[in-house]
Design a protein with these regions (language model features):
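Positively charged n-region of N-terminal signal peptides that target proteins for export
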Residues: 1-4
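General helical structural elements
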Residues: 6-7, 90
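Hydrophobic membrane-insertion alpha-helices, especially the h-region
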Residues: 7-19
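Contiguous segments within soluble domain cores/interaction surfaces
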Residues: 20-107, 111-123, 127-130
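Short beta-strand edge segments in extracellular beta-sheet folds
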Residues: 133-138
Length: 138
């Protein structure tokens, strides 16, 4: 009886361990992509928004969800998020102290009015982790 109970308990614990290990490995490694008007001293987004004016500096931030991820690639799009609409690719974006990947888009003559998008990938991966979209209006 005691041996059977120990065996059942061991199988149950192994199953729970496999389940949580699978969940941990397959969930997104970078989450919560947001657009903001500022970034604080620690690197967290402030003033979340999805609408900007042409002269604004646009900030994109996404939170790291796995401790071993320290570099990312961020891609900016003009229009729909599609390969042909890419206009800026930022390689080697490093996680900050607040555990966010953050970058900014600033154009001296101002951004054109329209719809934009941003995606983020773990460095070396083709799998999009999260995205955000925003509009530029006068």
């Amino acid at each position: 009886m005691k041996k059977a109970l120990i065996t059942i308990l061991a199988v149950f614990l192994l199953g729970v361990g496999v389940f949580f290990g699978y969940e941990y490995a397959t969930e997104p490694k970078i989450v919560d992509g947001v657009m903001s008007k500022k970034i604080d001293d620690k690197g967290r987004p402030i003033g979340l928004t999805s609408t900007f004016e042409p002269g604004d500096t646009v900030y994109f931030s996404a939170k790291r969800n796995r401790f071993w991820i320290d570099k990312a690639q961020i891609v900016w799009y003009k229009g729909e998020i599609a390969p042909e609409n890419r206009f800026l690719v930022e390689e080697e974006v490093i996680v900050n102290k607040a555990k966010y990947f953050s970058t900014e888009l600033s154009v001296p003559e101002g951004l054109e009015e329209g719809h934009y998008g941003v995606t983020i990938y773990v460095k070396g991966s083709d799998i999009m982790e999260t995205k955000a979209e925003f509009d530029v209006k006068k």
